[in-house]
């Protein structure tokens, strides 16, 4: 039987370009966050921040940005430049971000599009993404994060080959699958409190420990270290 706890905490969540970058069912990550949040006594107030809208780095406790089709991602790549300064401020102030697929790419310097064009990201993180000719990384994937002692499961489907840069470390080491680029045995990224990944599934629906970790981090940022949360079954 599910037990909901009376809310003692609140988190404000920005779903960046949620009306455009929503192709792969990764909105399920927000459903998962809300599911666990209710069990932990947390109310999540979410809103979409899209094109022509300002991003306020002081308003939000959590940011989610997913992936989309090529056309929509190009639109977003142009608009997100107007949010570059505020997003970078949010990141450098230890704001929590979960970025998936195209959203992950856009936080870096650039990615190569379907027609070979170079599409600028915001360069808040030091990675870049190349493309593959007539090939995609597709299939089940499993990684292990040694720092947290956690294993994550998902499904990857991407043409991009992402290479991490200074200050970045992978979300995990490949146990099964291809990961960021098929070469260095890493998948995803962690930089400060930014988590990026190519995992679909959605990632949080299949990896409870990661979902709870993100919620804990956002709460500690907002309320300090003394956060009293119930243990989840």
Regions flagged by a language model, labelled:
Residues 62-66, 98, 196-198:
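Structural motif
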Residues 181-217:
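A glycine-centered loop/beta-turn motif at secondary-structure junctions
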Residues 17-19, 159-161, 201-203:
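Glycine-rich beta-alpha junction loops
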Residues 1-89, 205-206, 211-233:
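N-terminal beta1-alpha1 cap of cysteine-dependent amidohydrolase-like domains
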Residues 46-48, 124, 154-156, 194-196:
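Conserved beta-strand scaffold positions in the cores of enzyme catalytic domains, especially
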Residues 114-187:
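Pocket-forming structural segment of enzyme catalytic cores
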Residues 70-145:
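Cysteine-nucleophile active-site neighborhood
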Residues 11, 148-152, 190-195:
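Beta-strand-turn-beta hairpins that frame and shape the catalytic cleft
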